[in-house]
Amino acid sequence: MNTELKLCQLLLAGVLLAGTCAARDLSTINPPFPRIGNCYGAGLGSKTWEEGSNYWSKLSLIIGGGYALSYDWEQPHWPKKLAKVEENIARLRQVNPHVLVLPYVDVVESSDDPAVPKHWWALKNGERWSGWPGKFRINTALTEVLQFNLDKVRTEICGRECFDGVFYDVWGPDDWLVPRTAELRDGKAVVMLNDGSLPRKGFASLNGVLAEDEINRVIDGKVDFEDFLARYLRWTRESRKPVVTMIVCRPQNINNDPSYWHKLNWKERQAICERARASDDKTMRLGLATALMGDGYFGYDAGTSERGTWWWYREYDAPLGHPHGPARRNADGTWQRDFDGGTVVVNGTLFDVVAELRAKSRDVSTGRVGTRFTLPSFDGRIFLPTDEPATTAADVAPRVTAKPPETLRVAKLDNGVIAVQTPGGLELRFDREAKLRHVIWRSQPLLTGGWPLARIQSSREFHSDSISGGVAEASDGEVKLTFSGTLGAESQRVAFTETCVVKPDNRFTLRFDFTAATDLDLRVWRHDFALPVARYANAAVSTDAKRVTLPAALKDESLLPSAKHVTIETGDTTLNMESSVGWSLVDHRKYGTDEYLLTGYPVRGAVKQGTQWSVEISITVAAKRAAN
């Protein structure tokens, strides 16, 4: 009898679960553009309908939003919060049936929760370790860990009709968890993840991925815009439907260090967010216009430590409707897409351009009316057709173009960026923190780097406390830039002076002078230059002792031992580098970035207060002579 009763209970539970697993039909999901999303901060579980409905009703994608799990599925507050989530979503779908809601699941880490089995913790030297303040890593190599997460997603998320699928944070397109999750709800569960950048695989099992702050890395010179856009368009084209790939980015001038935010109270965080809201609309426009080149979503907020701020911009309200077709690349390097309600142009190049439209239009961002618009580097605009009279005043002139100047030239760009151009086609760009963000040759990115990557033993990274300086001297014979300031990580400090001298014959010398202002305990102090694989594959690299050809496909991590003189020959260009420290060459694709890395290590370990050291690099760029 007990056996029969138990069987009946199991059958009844199965019937009930099957009923709750019923998913709504997502085949008709097709919200108009722009498609705005919120990562982690929608507050469906903490806000009342009256408090949040005006904002929620304008969103097309909500990630997390009140139901965010990190091995704390049994927390006593979840039932009450979940009830509010379900109520708000039910009301939201009545006014906004296109919105998709994906609860957040963290597979890789948990708070110090006694409910987590001890053997699940990931250990280093026998101790738990943290990759995020207040969290400890989980050993995701254990199949039982993945099975636990899959089972919870099946019952607690896909078992609730209010949710459309799941979002896995800090997770890539693996061969176990993602494919099994994609099978839930008869293969109709929406599956999205955040792999840090847009991966190059996983299309068959995923509806989309989060491009978290990759737009910021484009601006920083760490990611090529064309490569990023190609990956984004592929995800919106080839992934499962409905597409949920989303671009999210932050103001360039906001501190994105999680250890910094971890020390702030709520009021301090909110004050920073409010100041940042209108501090960098240009990055917002670049991200939004890039997202509009494909069928994905966009979000702009205060960064990884305060993701999901409720910021809204006039561009979000542009009535674009739906696209007439795919985006197209223009001859000047810009991309353009036409919609029912207007045209979007994005300039992901390193130079200002003049966009020309067929019909008289109004720039949503500036209010300017006409057919010709100056579009700065790393910017985007939405143009709506109008019968308004054209703006009579001339538009701003382009500040830097692909055409080299006749003599050495200095230009000041957005966000404190300083550009130095030579008559031969070399250009250097320094940001407000004295970092050499771009080395450009004949209008194309050549390399990035030079600035130190430095961490103390706790893995906290050095960041600038204060920096001053800029152009010290400028003449036809040379341009000299000088910066000085302090770098800090927790209580450890380093004072520095940086100088850069640029000559008209396409030579520049970059020098750093450092002084340990306190005792230092360094995990790493590294200077590097990144060489994009797309440009340098099959290039010849030589030192005084060895010569190699850079492999098109990843083979060995180590490519060249340390040397102070390095020559790189690629296509029609030759680079010669002379340095006070030795540089080794590694294939950084082993660590997930498509670049070869020249790395130098001037100091390491324990460094006494007052210790001084210098790093000087001279680089000459020249057109390679044609073979006879």
Q: Model segments located where?
A:
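N-terminal secretory signal peptides that target proteins for export/translocation
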Residues: M1-L5
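Beta-strand-rich N-terminal accessory domains
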Residues: D395-R460, D556, A563-T574, S579, ...
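Beta-strand-rich recognition/accessory modules
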Residues: Q421, L446-H463, T486-G488, D521, ...
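Extended, loop-rich substrate-binding clefts of extracytoplasmic carbohydrate-active enzymes
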Residues: R455-A517, D521
